[in-house]
């Protein structure tokens, strides 16, 4: 099957926002208007197409990035009348699922940032915005829920400027707000758009309402000034008072959006069907095609030299696997974005990260959780492959004769863990395999066995994250499990620099064991993890034993010296040592490395670290004092407060250990009228009295 649309007519977009900005409803409307849906699903009825997991339908939130494809022909704009393909990734808004947002942004060419006209910029909007900045993703902003009481378009625009540090430029302004929201003024064409009251999908063009003429003129001048600043020809025309055509405005706006110097802002009410078609026109007009993105960079795994791939079908095949999912019917699905070349179903690809070759059985284009078979996929496409067993998130798939490794994806470490125990013997047999499958799908989910207790521990990004995964165990894998209390993922590090000798000697008849190392330990800056440096001079330890010393140190770091938690941010230099011609072995040096590290760590002022969370609470004013008092009582450090959308917000840094069960406390304290968001910020030293309690607990556990 040949390519359906030219590459410059493809848009790979994400829809990003915080919870309750109307993201899933907006996606539903897009699918309806582009002809992919014949009946619209409502989130609050649990019938939305893109939310296809049971847990999503129940909770009314989006957990996994469902991918879908559709076609749109703009009615207005520089591309009017030309058919385009839009691949959409619907991303979750809950902070526990930030990894889903992160990995979808990595493979997108543009995004629609949704904001609630009442709430404006919520905490999660800031998180997602930072992630989009990190990948340089061009955005348009869509201020949704204009029909809600308290809707304020201009306040939302102001919040985008002030809280996100962006340069929002409205290209529409609303006609009416709240129940009176009837449509908008198109500032480029200077026309009014009024929607049918019953059916929002029909509208008529009218002259700008008399009472809005001055305001529309002011905002058009604002838009013209913003685009003129970025183009000398336009600036000259503007200063001379010459007419500027619609095409000229759109062309400069497009360039400014692509380099993220302007964020065009639109408005609407997806629920009431108002504004979605014009937002789709803006997606085509202002967001990037794979051609605009230009070359993708990587390196040749054989020579390590940098190489590039042009976004063309004629180039060698290169794609990034950005998501692994388990499908009840076809098994493991690997979602990938094609950057160059063509992939035919049934052909072989090289995983250039592992060096393994695998056959792609079938290629599917996903529509939420329904699928369509494709014979081939082309540069710029987003699709799913069946049959790839060894591929992990972030791996590069490419032509085996022209290997390339694309930039990998980096994911945050989990901060919370719980013990899970199978309820029956049958569950026990399935538990390990089921957890392994879930860990394969989600890079921020870890599974390990506690060596002391034999318990299975699962770790993730938050309570909701783990709750959903345990729920999936039950529903998808039919595994019943008992779940323990959430535990904090504490860490240990050192504050001092020391040198220490580690010696392992066994020489009592027969072949002995001998290994002696001298190590220097020093602290690394936060987040650097672990660094090993070989400073051996004059062959004091033969080269072949040095990796064993490193392995022994890393083994010892898993079980810290303060309270047995993993150690981090430590630099270890191997500076001297001794070996024995006959008795030395890899094992002897591994044990010596471990002994040396433990001894050095005890002398290097070791400390316990705990995860600190960035918390934001939004509450009615009458509960503000209670909320702040409660946060302070949780060892929280208040960082700021203010007013937003008629409510008060409080920002604080609070240890994760103090936040368990917070949602229940907050609900009862505010009669359910407050809400909060929380995300991992950093690790910080635990106060001495709490560290001592934790040590006693661990020691008590060990001696039982």
Swiss-Prot record:
UniProt keywords, alphabetically: Cytoplasm, Elongation factor, GTP-binding, Nucleotide-binding, Protein biosynthesis
> Looking at the record's lineage, which domain of life comes first?
Bacteria
Q: Which CDD domains match?
A: EF-G, EFG_III, EFG_mtEFG1_IV, EFG_mtEFG_C, EFG_mtEFG_II
Q: An example of a Gene Ontology BP annotation on this entry?
A: ribosome disassembly
Q: What is its main location?
A: cytoplasm
User: Per its record, what are the GO molecular function terms?
Assistant: GTP binding; GTPase activity; translation elongation factor activity
Keyword check for Cytoplasm = yes
In which compartments does the protein localize? Answer: Cytoplasm
Where in the numbering of this chain does the tr-type G domain appear? 8-291
Q: Which Pfam families match?
A: EFG_C, EFG_III, EFG_IV, GTP_EFTU, GTP_EFTU_D2
Summarizing the function annotation, the protein's role is: Catalyzes the GTP-dependent ribosomal translocation step during translation elongation. During this step, the ribosome changes from the pre-translocational (PRE) to the post-translocational (POST) state as the newly formed A-site-bound peptidyl-tRNA and P-site-bound deacylated tRNA move to the P and E sites, respectively. Catalyzes the coordinated movement of the two tRNA molecules, the mRNA and conformational changes in the ribosome.
Q: Which family does it belong to?
A: Belongs to the TRAFAC class translation factor GTPase superfamily. Classic translation factor GTPase family. EF-G/EF-2 subfamily.
Q: Output this protein's name.
A: Elongation factor G
